[in-house]
């Protein structure tokens, strides 16, 4: 996974030394690694692949700037994910809902996780960024290079598809 990269240990956790060379980089890495790993994991569906993506995100971001912002890190993540998945235009199109599908009540976490993984890549990333990480639509739009209305539409389409997938799994 990290072939040829020397490891440095800080408080028991492993950090690639190619990524973390100073205290400020360590602070940036520590502040953002969990958020970025979660997004990478949900987009790849694989722990090892998510770790590789995470490493590449930080290497790329630290090559661009000594102190990359959260948005720069997000853009680096999207660039890495684009190499793995077809991110781009919204892929779902739903007609107006004539009725609300019956998914009220408790939904098992494993059912929701499976449904999220079945969403198309762009809608999944918008859903994870907005509902999972609390990003605003303007930030999502800037990060993905889409318009704010497209971000809103992608979130709505993703939620409708989740509702459909959850209703069908019952």
PLM regions with names:
Residues 2-38, 67:
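A short, charge-rich alpha-helical start-of-domain segment used by transcription regulators
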Residues 33, 38-41, 51-94, 98:
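Σ70-family region 2.3-2.4 aromatic/basic alpha-helix that recognizes the −10 promoter
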Residues 91-117:
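Acidic, proline/glycine-rich intrinsically disordered inter-domain spacer in sigma factors
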Residues 126-127:
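A short pre-motif secondary-structure segment
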């Amino acid at each position: 996974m990290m072939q040829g990269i020397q490891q440095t240990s800080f408080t028991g956790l492993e950090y690639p030394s190619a990524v973390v060379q100073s205290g400020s980089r360590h602070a940036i890495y520590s502040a953002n690694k969990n958020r970025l790993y979660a997004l990478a994991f949900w987009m790849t569906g694989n722990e090892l692949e998510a770790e590789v993506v995470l490493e590449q995100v930080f290497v790329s971001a630290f090559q661009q700037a000594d102190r990359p912002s959260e948005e720069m890190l997000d853009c680096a993540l999207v660039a890495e994910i684009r190499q793995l998945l077809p991110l781009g235009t919204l892929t779902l199109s739903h007609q107006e809902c004539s009725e609300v599908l019956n998914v009220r009540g408790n939904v098992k976490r494993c059912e929701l996780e499976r449904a999220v993984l079945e969403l198309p890549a762009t809608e999944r990333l918008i859903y994870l960024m907005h509902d999972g990480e609390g990003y605003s639509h303007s930030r999502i739009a800037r990060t993905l290079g889409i318009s704010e209305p497209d971000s809103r539409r992608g979130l709505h389409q993703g939620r409708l598809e989740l509702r459909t997938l959850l209703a069908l799994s019952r």
